Amino acid sequence: MDFPSIKIKDFEGPFDLLLHLIKKNQMDIYNVEISKITNQYLKYIDDMKFMDLEITSEFIVVAATLIEIKSKHLLPKIKKDEDEDEEDQEKNLIEKLILYKKIKRVAEFFKDRYVNSGELYTKKPEIIEEINLPNNNEDIFKNLTLLELYNMYNNLLEIYNNKQNKANVIQKRIYVDKYKIEDKLEYLLGLIENNEVSKFSEIIDKCECKLECIVSFLALLEMVKLKKVRVYQSDSFDNILIERRQDEGEE
């Protein structure tokens, strides 16, 4: 027996499914074709039943609402009040969809911030303290022309403005423990295990940034301190060569 091919995607709720269908059909959220969306929504519910997946009451409620709105579109309009009820019902559904879309976007924003928060530290903007100059400033202004004084004032003003953090946001991220000495130590030990002599320049070439270069160098110093390796140069400013010590750990 051949079973139909059905693709089921997990949705957080009925509005998540509706937004997916609207996006899939390239519709404007403010001008949704209820009839088309209803058919696809009900098809998804049928697929869930076929796959014996649990259907929550929220999906059923929205399905009933869509069917009611669609049926009112198809039936002849008799009274003005009924037209208004139909418009209100459809309007309420669209408003809930728009609200859900906004909430979902905000939730994704905070989720990204939460995930990234473990990788960095932040600090509050610095308060620039005024410099207390001595009471007697006569020596500072001796032999200064008016133009020099004017340029000095402009330079100080520019420095002060550049130090102001008007956005109240620290743009630079300081990553925490992305490169650890312990990890580099283990990496270097594995490297010299497989090679009789290793060039430090080749290790540096594989580093992603300046910070990783520094951590690699500190790890090398730690290895020398622990008497794990011997480092030497053939000449000044030549390659730093790393060699595993045969008398490892001995004085």
Swiss-Prot record:
Its main location: cytoplasm. Belongs to the ScpA family. Component of a cohesin-like complex composed of ScpA, ScpB and the Smc homodimer, in which ScpA and ScpB bind to the head domain of Smc. The presence of the three proteins is required for the association of the complex with DNA. GO terms for biological process: cell division; chromosome segregation; DNA replication. Coiled coil: none annotated. GO terms for cellular component: cytoplasm. It comes from the Bacteria. Pfam families: SMC_ScpA (PF02616). The keyword rRNA-binding does not apply. It is found in: Cytoplasm. Participates in chromosomal partition during cell division. May act via the formation of a condensin-like complex containing Smc and ScpB that pull DNA away from mid-cell into both cell halves. It comes from Clostridium botulinum (strain Eklund 17B / Type B). Keywords: Cell cycle, Cell division, Chromosome partition, Cytoplasm. This is Segregation and condensation protein A.
